[in-house]
Amino acid sequence: VISMHQVGFTNAGASLGTALTSGHASLLKRYTQEVLLLYDSDDAGVRAALRAIPILREAGVSSRVVNLKPHKDPDEFIKALGAEEFEKRLEQAMDSFMFRVHMAEREFPMEEPQGQNRFFERCAQMLLELSDELERNLYIEAIVKDYRNSGISVENLKKRVGALAMKGTPAEQRIQPKPVGAGQQLSLIHISEPTRLQLIS
């Protein structure tokens, strides 16, 4: 956070010692419409981001995820590449739903038909979480675009979502991000636009 302030990202803060909560998300909602997540680029940081995304969404705050690799955190990134490159990474932040999709991909052997099938089943489960039909259809198209080499089509994915909706998805099958320990650090950044906020660690 200090490093960010020093290079001009002056609306930065950190929860320091606790994971993001619904209370934090409600507070953020008072000041911004969008949050950028900049957790550490290691596995713990990924889990923290996955946990934060639905909490923010529930509070009505949209989110995107910033890729800091090959550096671990904003401090390392800024020291190595500077504020201008850091700003570019912020601008390239990934939509949080698609971030969840790409992280889910890691769990399946995508070189095998069975792995691909299970992955798209997971995608369908996540799509069912979206109550707005237009939003759901837009993400279906985005998934198909990103994974067109796997042979998935908009029609096929819509059918999979529809089939799950008809029979209902058991609670134990729904996606639940792994919990983040209480020691996970969270940081917040607010860029110049008053309607956009960003989260880092």
Locate each region found by the language model.
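Alpha-helix C-terminal capping segments
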Residues: 2-10, 31
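Short hydrophobic/aromatic-enriched beta-strand-loop microsegments
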Residues: 10-17
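A charged alpha-helical hairpin associated with nucleic-acid processing machineries
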Residues: 19-35, 39-188, 192, 196
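Cationic, low-complexity basic patches in intrinsically disordered or flexible, solvent-exposed regions
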Residues: 199
